[in-house]
Amino acid sequence: QCWIEAPFHCDYGTQITIGDHFFANYDCIFLDVAPIVIGNHVFLGPRVSLYTAGHPLTAQIRNLELEFGKPITIGDSVWIGGDTTVLPGVTIGPETVVAAGSVVTKDLPGGVIAAGNPCRVLRSLSEEDRAFWLAQREAYLQGST
């Protein structure tokens, strides 16, 4: 199951691999000049941008219209908040939460909460986090019956 809200933009579409139970909210952009690999149970907020493309820093070379591509990999069960940009070559580990508005310039390990520009790890997800959200789920289910 894969759900992508319109509008959505990608360069080619042939370099994108998406796992099961994927959701991308409105206005996502995937610049896929290099592979983008997305795991299972991944959620993207509105206006998340995945940029595999980059350009040389020096104007003389950039003016030759050269670009490069580096892959992006997003692990299973990752949630990326809205208005986040993921730059070329980044890997985001499984079960990580990236806060809205972040700019991810470097790899993030699994099981953490990360935020900022540049994005950095704030803390690891804990057993207390898991217990809290399991209790919230139970309360929700009891209230909806």
Indicate residue ranges for each PLM-predicted region:
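Acidic/histidine-enriched, glycine/proline-rich intrinsically disordered or flexible terminal extensions
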Residues: R130-T145
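Flexible, glycine/small-residue-enriched loop-and-beta-strand segment within the central core
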Residues: A6-I18, F23-T91, N117, R123-L134
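HATPase_c (GHKL) ATP-binding subdomain of two-component histidine kinases
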Residues: K106, A115, V121
